[in-house]
């Protein structure tokens, strides 16, 4: 099976994603990993039989990711990249790592209608309740864990 994994960060060094991808490769699947790059890294690379595709990002997109479910700029920016990734690798299923990029994947997938697995590594809405910057102005009024 051709599996598209979506990660909203650099790769490597995420061991949870790497271990999961390697397990899928070892089980006979073809894994294509969408990830971001912030420097001069290879756009396409084979790492431990994981087909890594890196898409250029920047500090502004990174900061906008905190507002992904408040103001959808990040979602709109990522949707375009993810749509291109899906069109290029032609997966049979999409595996999303983490909630920040999930809405962008759902929107990008509307025209493909592929099955999606959402793997929430962390309960981000609960974790966000502990962030000091979300307990005071302006974070308290801009970012709502309930929306996540």
Regions found by a protein language model. Give the residues of each.
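Active-site beta-loop-alpha junctions enriched in small/polar residues
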Residues: 8, 99, 123
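Structural motif
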Residues: 34, 96-97, 119
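Short, hinge-like loop/turn segments at secondary-structure boundaries
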Residues: 48-53, 112-113, 133-137
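An amphipathic, basic-hydrophobic alpha-helix
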Residues: 62-94, 100-113, 145-148
């Amino acid at each position: 099976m051709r599996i598209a994994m979506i990660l909203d960060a650099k790769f490597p060094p995420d061991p949870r994603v790497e271990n999961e991808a390697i397990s899928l490769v070892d089980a006979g699947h073809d894994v294509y990993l969408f990830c971001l790059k912030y420097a001069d890294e290879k756009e396409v690379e084979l790492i431990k039989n994981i087909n890594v595709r890196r898409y250029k990002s920047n500090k502004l997109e990174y900061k906008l990711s905190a507002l992904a479910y408040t103001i959808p700029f990040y979602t709109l920016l990522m949707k375009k990249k993810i749509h291109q990734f899906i069109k290029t690798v032609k997966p049979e299923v999409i595996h999303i790592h983490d909630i920040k990029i999930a809405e962008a994947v759902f929107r990008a997938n509307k025209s493909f209608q592929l099955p999606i697995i959402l793997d929430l590594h962390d309960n981000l809405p609960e974790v966000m309740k502990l962030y000091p910057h979300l307990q005071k102005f302006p974070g308290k009024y801009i970012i709502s864990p309930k929306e996540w």
